[in-house]
């Protein structure tokens, strides 16, 4: 069966459904990498700027959307900045298991389904639950790459179902200057 559109799962309804030991057939998390670029702390000390993609509304982001956004940002940064000139981290993990009560809509389907009887649904995917102000992507870089980082995060935001903003800061322990772009 095809994947349902994101609008079916964007809003949070009910408690999180995360206990894998009780869920038979829960899908695996299909995000292979959460840290990209320069991952060693010693090499990251040379980066003086920080960019964050921050979500503005409460909701759920499916793992397919997170992976599409990650690939979009990673490919753009690898091509235009180079893997040795940035650090990118995906901060959220899709722990919540989505359920789907599959309904068939074809001739003879009434013999195959139960309607709303036993309508709890079977596992159909995973999603990350996010709150306003939560960081989705975190990037460290040098000041000369600020335009490419902003473009990569903008492209990643286009794959997400919730409104986001890009926050750019200087990387120091005291907070520093903050620049926000919607």
UniProtKB/Swiss-Prot annotation:
**PROSITE patterns according to UniProt:** RIBOSOMAL_L10E (PS01257)
Keywords assigned by UniProt, alphabetized: Ribonucleoprotein, Ribosomal protein
Q: Which GO cellular component terms, listed alphabetically, does the Swiss-Prot or TrEMBL entry include?
A: ribonucleoprotein complex; ribosome
Taxonomically, the superkingdom here is Archaea
Record GO biological process: translation
The UniProt entry, under InterPro entries, shows: Ribosomal_uL16, Ribosomal_uL16_arc, Ribosomal_uL16_CS_euk_arc, Ribosomal_uL16_dom, Ribosomal_uL16_euk_arch, Ribosomal_uL16_sf
Q: Which Pfam families match?
A: Ribosomal_L16 (PF00252)
Q: Where is the signal peptide?
A: none
What SUPFAM superfamilies does this protein map onto? Answer: Ribosomal protein L16p/L10e
The record's GO molecular-function terms, alphabetically, read: structural constituent of ribosome
Q: Which family does the similarity line name?
A: Belongs to the universal ribosomal protein uL16 family.
Protein name as annotated: Large ribosomal subunit protein uL16
What is the organism field in this record?
Pyrobaculum islandicum (strain DSM 4184 / JCM 9189 / GEO3)
Provide the taxonomic classification. Answer: Archaea, Thermoproteota, Thermoprotei, Thermoproteales, Thermoproteaceae
